[in-house]
Amino acid sequence: MGEARTIRKQEVAVLRHAIAAGITLIDTAEMYGDGGAEEVLGEALRGTGGERDRLFIVSKLYPWNASRHDTKVACERSLKRLGTDRIDLYLLHWRGEHSLADTVSAFEELKRDGKIRHWGVSNFDTDDMRELYAVTDGSNCATNQVYYNLARRWPEASLLPWQRERGISTMAYSPLDQGKLINRPSLASIAARLGVTPSQVALAWLMHEKDVVAIPKSSRIEGVDEILGARRVKLDVADIALLNKAFPPPKSNASMETT
């Protein structure tokens, strides 16, 4: 999103449809379209008739902008592109060369100034999270956004248990494994029985996980409606057993994966 101005009108329309249909969490980043995605979201928000207060906007910071000074500068740029006075959740996109202490200090200052409501990280493994927790105010981390889906269950080995013990939620990006999951027989079988789509089954599986928030994406209105429909899918014990057989939980030494 935000990479081509020729389709911006379509992207804005899809976002406005999603907001009108009841989607409240919208995830973006300064990396997406080099700020273009934030601009598209900002344009969409301007036409929603005051829906901003109902929405939970997530954006992410480049790691090379994560010094104490540059974090605040980057946040101001994102706020301007989004056309809003605050970001609900601001994440470090992945770990870089700047110290976690400096980044956290900047996040806490942005919170005090009302520029952001919460902060977190993305693409951190368990060791990274332990290091984060060791710095001053590191325990204020609200979430960790990671690559997690039925085919990529590595967070279950140690990351999810560690975060749950500390009240840190997990945001699952690429919940459909970049579309690779939709042709898997086990998903198709459950979907056919329930009268839904394989994508909706994959999303429903994530939604039943404690403290996990799935963040699927779609560039089409039909895709948005399919995502919304996943909330009504109820998987039973037999469904979960079938999925666990087709997509076994990880071994204890599973390592982090990213897209």
What are these regions (language model features)?
Residues 1-9, 59-69, 93, 98:
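Active-site mouth loops of central-metabolism enzymes
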Residues 1-55:
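N-terminal binding-site loop/beta-alpha segment at the start of enzyme catalytic domains
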Residues 5-18, 67-82, 102, 127-131:
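Short, acidic/polar
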Residues 17, 21, 81-82, 114, ...:
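Structural motif
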Residues 26, 87, 119:
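Glycine-centered flexible beta-alpha turn that most often forms the glycine-rich phosphate-binding loop
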Residues 52-65, 89-93, 123, 146-148:
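A short, structured active-site edge motif that brings together acidic residues
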Residues 71-93, 109-113, 135:
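CE4/NodB-like, metal-dependent polysaccharide N-deacetylase domain
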Residues 95-259:
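Beta/alpha (TIM)-barrel catalytic core signal, keyed to glycine-rich beta->alpha loops juxtaposed to Asp/Glu
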